[in-house]
Amino acid sequence: MSFLPLCHAYERVLVYLYHFLGFSIYYAENLGTIAENIKEVHPTMMTCVPRVLEKMYDKLYLAGKKQKGIKKRLYYWAFELAKHYKLDDNSAWYNLKHKVADKLIYSKWREAIGGNFDIVVSGGAAIQKHQAAFFNAIGMPVFEGYGLSETSPVIAVSARGKGNRVAGTVGPALPGVEIKITAENEIICKGPNVMLGYYKDPEQTAEVIDKDGWFHTGDTGRFTPEGLLIITGRLKHIFKTSFGKYINPFLIEEQFCKSPFIENMVVLGENQKFAAALIHPDMIYLKDFCKRHEITYTDDASLLTHADVKAIFNKELKKFNPLFAHHEQIKAYELVSEEWSVDNGILTPTLKVKRNIIQQRYKDLIDKLFE
């Protein structure tokens, strides 16, 4: 199953691989029909981005709200169990519970998402560890990878075999590719996959490929003791407050986006006294919650200014803020009802938020946060 833009190196190279392996390729009609098309095609392999998996995860979570009594308790017991799945290191007790959950719950979920997946490649951004574990547990094997267009477009990827695929890591380096972590925690690499340079732009090329041939990715990361790469953020996105404290927005956003109420979030605060955020709620989940709790509103704008809705997000802040140092905690936020999408230019083709566009588009709202 293919649905990412073919102009993007990530999808294009994987399509070349499908052709090489003799696969039949089915193209989704559009992003909105992916779930429906998966049921029609029953694919064995798919390349995707974490945002698509997050939406599947959220839909499965929301579906449990329709259950009642013992069925509902069993549904969410299985849901929580899946989040703690380990590929090679589960206890005998966990495996027994997993076997029961698979018989009663996971088998139905697999059927709902095609029922035939053997490999799901996730790239373009980091997937949350508990979500990768969840899909592995229910029988939708997620293989995480990492790279850039400049690296053709992969430098590390999870692989079959004990210890080569661990949720939250992007696997070991590809054969023939060297990866190092600099003193600034930047990921740099060298290998035959690295580009020769930017077309007719030697100055920009020199900015990313040093004299020793190392390509500087601009991303930060670290290795596990077993040699698996973990992505921790984007070097240029790390900023400093007016008090000289560094903040990595990626780590904060990753935690807050575990909330079913939050679809996307951008942490701000460069040269400011504190960290703040623009939050795009998961409007489907939020509206369903309001319906179940009889919270009335007239439109999206009135929904996001409703006192009960504000209370919900204040509670989420109190839940996640303690996970961070005082200077990293979100002190102010604004809810944004406008959809963040590829069509309106806020998301990249791999569904990552364009921070510069956010800062331009919501300048007045951001200024208000720091008044």
Could you tell me what each predicted segment is?
Residues H8-Y10, R51, G124-Q131, E144-G161, ...:
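Conserved A3 ("GATE") glycine/threonine-rich loop of ANL adenylate-forming enzymes
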Residues L6-Y106, N116:
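Conserved AMP-binding/adenylation subdomain of ANL enzymes
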Residues G163, A167, V194-G218, I252-E253, ...:
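Conserved ANL (AMP-binding/adenylate-forming) active-site segment centered on the GW(Y/F)…HTG consensus within
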Residues T220, P225, S259-Y285:
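C-terminal boundary motif of the adenylate-forming
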Residues A173-T241:
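Conserved ATP-binding/catalytic segment of the ANL
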Residues F239, N264-V267, F289, K310, ...:
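Conserved C-terminal "lid"/linker of ANL adenylate-forming enzymes
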Residues V194, L228-C257, L286-A307, H326-I330, ...:
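Adenylate-forming
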